[in-house]
Amino acid sequence: MNFIVEALNEVRKRKPLVHNITNFVVMNTTANALLALGASPVMAHAEEELEEMIGLADAVVINIGTLDSWWRKSMIKAVEIANEMKKPIVLDPVGAGATKLRTKVALEILDRGVTVLKGNFGEISSLLGEFGKTRGVDSSEYDEEKAKVLALSAAKEFNTTVAVTGAVDYVSDGGKVFAIYNGHKLLERVTGTGCIVTAITGAFVAVTEPLRAAISSLVVFGIAAEKAYEEAKYPGSFHVKLYDWLYRIDGEVIRKYAKVREVGV
C-alpha cells in the first residue's frame, strides 16, 4: 500500500495544521497524537475566531463528544466557514443514537457537507436510521457483514467518504469499499482512541484525497496499536506506547504490517 506510505511522508513533510473542535475528554490525547504523527494541532472553540483560525488551518475536525448548545453553534459555523474556504472537514458523531440531540446535531453538520465521516457501527447506523444501537459512545451491535454495507450506504446517502470502525474497519466513498484488519482489542480499554483516529484523519485528508486519507489513518493507527501491545500489555503503558509508535512508524513497518483490501458488497 504505497499510497499510505506516501501520505504519511507527506504529513511529516508538510506538518498540516489541524483545527480541532473536539471534546474535553480527549483534547490533550489527540493533540499529542497529532504531534507524534508529525502534524500540528490547534484546539480552538470560540465562535469569534473561527474564520481566522480556519483560514490558517489545513483541515478541520469536528468531534461532538462533549456537546452542548454553545459548542453546537461553533461546530456548525466552523463547517460552514470551512466549506466556503474549501478546507477538508472530518466529522466524528460521538454518541449519535444515544440521544436525540447528538443525532440531530450530527445530521445538521452532515447536511452542510463534510469530507470524511468516521464513527462506530451504532453511530453511523443511527444517522441512517438503521440497525445499530449506541450505548454512551460505544457501539453495542457490531456486525461485520452489515458494517461493510453500512459504510457503502452511508457514503452514498451523505455524499462523503465514510469510515465505520469496529473489529474490522470499513471505508467507502460510495463506490469502492475497503476493509482494514489492523488494530488491537486493548484499544477498547483506553479512552479517546477512536478520537485519535478522527484527529489523524484530519492530518491525512490535508495531504491526500479522502478515501486514501481514511484508509491511511486507520492502517497507521491500527499498526501503531499492534506494535504498542508488543511492548506494553496494560492500558496505561499501552496508551503511552501508542504515541511512541505514531512517532516511530515508517514505510518499512507499514509495508510489512498493513492489512487492508478492497471487498465486495
Curated annotation (Swiss-Prot):
<comment type="pathway">
    <text>Cofactor biosynthesis; thiamine diphosphate biosynthesis; 4-methyl-5-(2-phosphoethyl)-thiazole from 5-(2-hydroxyethyl)-4-methylthiazole: step 1/1.</text>
</comment>
<dbReference type="GO" id="GO:0004417">
    <property type="term" value="F:hydroxyethylthiazole kinase activity"/>
</dbReference>
<keyword id="KW-0547">Nucleotide-binding</keyword>
<feature type="binding site">
    <location>
        <position position="43"/>
    </location>
    <ligand>
        <name>substrate</name>
    </ligand>
</feature>
<feature type="binding site">
    <location>
        <position position="118"/>
    </location>
    <ligand>
        <name>ATP</name>
    </ligand>
</feature>
<comment type="similarity">
    <text>Belongs to the Thz kinase family.</text>
</comment>
<dbReference type="InterPro" id="IPR000417">
    <property type="entry name" value="Hyethyz_kinase"/>
</dbReference>
<comment type="function">
    <text>Catalyzes the phosphorylation of the hydroxyl group of 4-methyl-5-beta-hydroxyethylthiazole (THZ).</text>
</comment>
<protein>
    <recommendedName>
        <fullName>Hydroxyethylthiazole kinase</fullName>
        <ecNumber>2.7.1.50</ecNumber>
    </recommendedName>
</protein>
<keyword id="KW-0418">Kinase</keyword>
<dbReference type="InterPro" id="IPR029056">
    <property type="entry name" value="Ribokinase-like"/>
</dbReference>
<keyword id="KW-0808">Transferase</keyword>
<feature type="binding site">
    <location>
        <position position="165"/>
    </location>
    <ligand>
        <name>ATP</name>
    </ligand>
</feature>
<keyword id="KW-0067">ATP-binding</keyword>
<feature type="binding site">
    <location>
        <position position="192"/>
    </location>
    <ligand>
        <name>substrate</name>
    </ligand>
</feature>
<dbReference type="GO" id="GO:0005524">
    <property type="term" value="F:ATP binding"/>
</dbReference>
<keyword id="KW-0479">Metal-binding</keyword>
<dbReference type="GO" id="GO:0009229">
    <property type="term" value="P:thiamine diphosphate biosynthetic process"/>
</dbReference>
<keyword id="KW-0784">Thiamine biosynthesis</keyword>
<dbReference type="GO" id="GO:0009228">
    <property type="term" value="P:thiamine biosynthetic process"/>
</dbReference>
<dbReference type="Pfam" id="PF02110">
    <property type="entry name" value="HK"/>
</dbReference>
<keyword id="KW-0460">Magnesium</keyword>
<dbReference type="GO" id="GO:0000287">
    <property type="term" value="F:magnesium ion binding"/>
</dbReference>
